[in-house]
């Protein structure tokens, strides 16, 4: 999960910057990997998707009556490992929207170094 209360939201540009503090207490570190803990790539992607969902939920009316789901991931790349003690800065921006679908570009940085990037589609449906 991204950390609460750490989002910088620019509604005009439809972009957000969020923060994820990576601690050794994360349960996934028990098995990934016991002697060399590395944050799983799928969880880096999940933090990017959560950040993007915050944008969508702020843009739609009655967000409590909707679900946002990830419908496609393109060009997901990991450039560097994320380890306990790292602080991930996640940037997500809407680059295209049509009806109930949103295309995002997202990057993750640790200490100003690019560690991951992806493009993805998210869709909104009523509950």
Q: Which role fits each region the language model picked out?
A:
Residues 52-89, 115-117, 123:
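Hydrophobic beta-strand-centered segment that forms part of the acyl-chain substrate-binding groove
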Residues 1-38, 64-67, 79-83, 95-101, ...:
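Non-catalytic linker/capping segments at the edges of enzyme domains
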